[in-house]
Amino acid sequence: MAKITKEIVFGNHKLILETGEVARQADGAVMASMNGTQVLVTVVWKKDSGESNDFFPLTVNYQEKFYAIGKIPGGFNKREGRPSDNETLISRLIDRPIRPLFPDNFFNEVQIIATVLSLNPEVSPDIIAMIGASAALSISGVPFNGPIGAARVGYKDGVYLLNPSRKEQEESKLDLVIAGTKDAILMVESEAQELSEDIMRGAMLYGHEMMKSVIKSIEELAREVGKSKPEWKAPEIDTVLKARINDVARNEVEAAYLIKDKQQRYQRLDELREQTISALLAENDELNADVIANMFGELERSIVRNRILDGEPRIDGRDHRTVRPISIRTKFLERTHGSCLFTRGETQAIVVATLGNERDAQILDGISGETRDRFMLHYNFPPYSVGETGQVGSPKRREIGHGRLAKRALMAVLPDTNEFPYVLRIVSEITESNGSSSMATVCGTSLALMDAGVPLKAPVAGVAMGLIKEGDRYAVLTDILGDEDHLGDMDFKVAGTEKGITALQMDIKISGITNEIMERALEQALEGRTHILGVMNNALAEHRTELSQHAPRITTMKVAEDKIRTIIGKGGATIKGLIESTGVSIDIDDSGVIQLFSPDKMALEEAQKQIKALIAEIEVGQTYQGKVSKIVDFGAFINLLPGKDGLLHISQICAERTQKVEEVLQEGQEIEVFVAGIDKQGRVKLEWKDKPQAEAKEVEGASVSATFLTMEEQSEEINSGNKISEEEE
């Protein structure tokens, strides 16, 4: 096949889609490029019927290669290893908008691999990978109701930005990724700095409009080189069997969905499913139990959806706008730095905040460069939270994604580093789940941080919205249950403060939603969020003024850059000695900012005292309590400050010239001395007197900054012929 190229003007960039040259044995392969960032996306799908599957086995693997940026991977093996969290998140970003566009009951295996081959650090590869996946699917011949487009939207000074550069993104108040078909939005993922509902809705509409040129070009590419799609038809529905299941089970299923307790309801539905399968197999043993079970599930879906659309109470008895009952306990765990038990209906999370120092920050080494993450949020979803057994171990894709969403919701309200220099780690343990556990994590995180004494700019709450839509009838649901998520058409999570939205995630399972529905969902989400914030404020209105007694303390000092060497010492000896003597962790950066970290307040104060002594200047006219460090023929060296000595001449020690210094002073002896002067070489002249004499008053209070000589350096100066004479006194 000849190489085919499509060029699209996309914001300030030129997007190039190429096929026919690379990976020609894949069903679909597209090289997507934008200003030096190149991503190869391939699609392969199995042509067998997939009848052995009862789910759609779609796999998306996004991978970044270090050679793309001219780097060699770290580690012993010097090659790329398991996917990073960022790669996992982008894999999910590609998966979410394309999955709903495959036909119902299409169970053939499909694999998409997106590989970053070249990276311009100013151009993020995620949008390029999403567009490349859409193009590769569109030419692969797989049944796919696309294509989709994707775009990133920023917001600065009242203007929306299309696919902003990395520098522009740093100045933007919004980072929104949107994907959809030419007719409808399918997926939104965003982080914002407390923006209004209208601004967020406008960003979604703007991004959707801008991506239509990309969709048009992919359609043209598919017409030119796309493989013919097989005539795929969903298996025919056995209408007789469907009617029989309805007759046998409908009344009992309707009654089961009046049971408000999740576990009791599930137990009853399991019993009814097994009874229905047994009854129908007894009537006709040629029937397939899996087919009966699937039709039973369709009956459940129909009952729940129609009841909601008819205006009847939801599964747990609520109306469409009511949030489930909330209970909150802060200081839930005794020895943690901050903790919260957040319960909303049958969804519950124990959220724990831990404070650390700069050394606890996570170092992330990716192709975009090395970064330090000072705010970590880890979300755990153990199987017991839904009453099941299962494997426990490394976080799955869903856990990584939920943790990332909750983290983005809090980023806008975290204090500045100079105000609160701690590194923060949050762990959310989901102990019960019946929908919206990620939003429970958002609420619990806000409370746990305030419980730990973190001065958040504002509390943050989150709520998950749902949608039931049949034709022109629809209902938007606030604070959805797990069943309403599973049986519904939308999962729309919104988090924010009283002032505005900080994070938003939307996944649509149908062909799309109207602007009216989106506006209704945002309006109800604001109402629900405001209610939840009120409950949270009743439990803990402000952050604790004192840190937990179990939390470490951090003190920050700023010293002149020319003092850094003094504090570190030769080969790091001085700073190591400070750490060993005080037990305090000490970090100093190139700008002279020192961070002291210890659970012991007294140790922190001692370390501060020693550092101040290290960098202190000797002042002429001041009196110091010094220690005799060395005795020589012409006097004694007195240590005034760490690393700073002065000479007490023999004339200031002995009344008689024949008297020896050793007869008056001994090494280690402490005496009070007066700084009489500092010469151009930085040598300090001392007097052994109770108070300054009259002639010293001329310099009283004067401060002289100089390069002070140590005892050894002064001794060398004197021995080399620069001896301080009595006449100089």
Curated annotation (Swiss-Prot):
Which Pfam families does the UniProt record give?
KH_1 (PF00013), PNPase (PF03726), RNase_PH (PF01138), RNase_PH_C (PF03725), S1 (PF00575)
Reactions catalysed: RNA(n+1) + phosphate = RNA(n) + a ribonucleoside 5'-diphosphate
Q: Which residues form the S1 motif domain?
A: 621-689
Q: Name one GO biological process term.
A: mRNA catabolic process
Q: What keywords appear on the UniProt entry?
A: Cytoplasm, Magnesium, Metal-binding, Nucleotidyltransferase, RNA-binding, Transferase
Q: Where in the cell is it found?
A: Cytoplasm
* Subunit and interaction comment: Component of the RNA degradosome, which is a multiprotein complex involved in RNA processing and mRNA degradation.
Name of the protein in its database record: Polyribonucleotide nucleotidyltransferase
* Gene name for this UniProt entry: pnp
